[in-house]
């Protein structure tokens, strides 16, 4: 292996895209084989990116939530085909907006629809029902209260007909609470974080760790990065634990999780299994119909389908990726990125906190460079 080409590309990111800092890590068979950290977590204080830097993961929370839910699936707590309303009654009688009117939904929302973002839900945190719930709770709402407010709003399409990014994985967090009998955060701590040794994974970073958090910067080509005021709408209430966008952790912590999935659910460092290998294979199988594949049209994910909470490579030609079919993972709003390729026994993680995140520029390039580096001498 020779990672010189990857290093040379990464060196261009600060100058060409204006990134304040980044961290790129590569793992083979669960062991780190490459690491490059450059720039600052706090540019103004000259605090560099380091192994213990904590990143706001935003949507990279989603694969963790889906893994937790699939643990309960493995225990027979639900079937993917079960109507969601069997567990969360607020979703039993859903309506669909059609023009200026509403009609009853033709299909019930299934649990599979939550995993696959095909439930007809939205990402609207400012709907009339959400506003009323926030007033009624004086902004101290729980995960379940947010989900109950979401259920009062009409769906945008009949469940199962389309794909649309939404609060579906936040609903999965409420489902986990209902079927496990544990608060969502406690479930993750007991069944994901502690077994994997993820010591810095939090929905709300403790005060004694705040000095390790990477700031988010507005970035523009050829200009110095500008620090942005931190805002995460998915941490707006101290009682809300967002299964879709709420977690923060170090790249080293996330590597424990990603490498376990790459090894079929087995964590070599702690000798712990968090999922069965057959379940991991199911998670990374494309679940979308032809119609839904047309909806899943994000430019950085051309050639990918969508499984149970993760993108999954279905066409090398369509993506321009040399990776193995079934390579999977996800990314976060501030530019974090996970690539998991069981065929190559490979994990790559990229950490940054920037707006825009330049996903369509950075992610496919570091992916493509990586596979050549594995064979270089």
Predicted regions, residues:
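Active-site SXXK
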Residues: 4-10, 30, 56-84, 169-177, ...
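Short clusters of small/polar residues that mark proteolytic maturation junctions
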Residues: 37-39, 83, 229, 352
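Hydrophobic (often cysteine-bearing) scaffold residues that line and stabilize catalytic clefts
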Residues: 2, 6, 57, 61, ...
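Short, surface-exposed loop or secondary-structure junction motifs
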Residues: 92-322
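Generic C-terminus detector
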Residues: 353-377
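Acidic helix-start/capping segments at beta-turn-to-alpha-helix junctions
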Residues: 85-92
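Short, conserved catalytic-motif segment at the N-terminal edge
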Residues: 3-57, 77, 93-99, 232, ...
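Short, well-ordered beta-strand elements
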Residues: 36, 338-339, 345-354
């Amino acid at each position: 292996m020779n990672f010189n080409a990857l290093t040379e590309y990464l060196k261009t990111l600060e100058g060409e895209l204006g990134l304040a800092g980044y961290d790129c890590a590569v793992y083979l068979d669960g062991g780190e084989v490459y690491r490059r950290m450059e720039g600052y977590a706090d540019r103004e204080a000259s605090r560099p990116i380091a192994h213990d830097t904590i990143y706001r993961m935003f949507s990279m929370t989603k694969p963790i939530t889906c893994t937790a839910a699939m643990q309960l699936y493995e225990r027979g707590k639900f079937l993917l085909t079960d109507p969601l309303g069997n567990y969360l009654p607020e979703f039993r009688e859903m309506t669909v907006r059609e023009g200026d009117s509403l009609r009853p939904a033709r299909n019930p929302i299934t649990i599979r629809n939550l995993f696959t973002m095909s439930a007809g839900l939205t990402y609207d945190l400012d709907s009339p029902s959400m506003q009323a719930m926030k007033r009624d709770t004086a902004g101290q709402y729980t995960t379940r209260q947010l989900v109950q407010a979401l259920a009062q709003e009409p769906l945008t399409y009949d469940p199962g007909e389309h794909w649309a990014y939404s609060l579906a994985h936040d609903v999965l967090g409420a489902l986990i609470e209902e079927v496990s009998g544990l608060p969502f955060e406690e479930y993750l701590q007991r069944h994901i974080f502690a077994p994997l040794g993820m010591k810095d994974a939090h929905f709300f970073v403790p005060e004694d760790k705040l000095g390790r958090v990477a700031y988010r910067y507005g970035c523009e080509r050829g200009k110095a990065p500008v620090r942005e005021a931190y805002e995460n709408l998915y941490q707006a209430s101290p009682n809300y634990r967002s299964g879709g966008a709420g977690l923060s952790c170090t790249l080293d912590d996330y590597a424990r999780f990603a490498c376990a999935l790459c090894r079929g659910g087995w964590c070599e460092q702690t000798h712990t299994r968090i999922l069965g290998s057959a379940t991991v294979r199911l998670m990374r199988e494309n679940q979308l119909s032809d119609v839904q594949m047309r909806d899943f049209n994000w430019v950085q994910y051309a050639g990918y389908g969508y499984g149970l909470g993760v993108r999954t490579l279905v066409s090398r030609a369509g993506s321009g990726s040399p990776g193995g079919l079934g390579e999977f993972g996800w990314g976060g709003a501030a530019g974090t990125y996970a690539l998991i390729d069981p065929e190559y026994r490979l994990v790559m993680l990229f950490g940054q906190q920037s707006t825009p995140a330049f996903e369509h520029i950075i992610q496919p390039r570091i992916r493509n460079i990586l596979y050549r580096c594995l064979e270089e001498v």
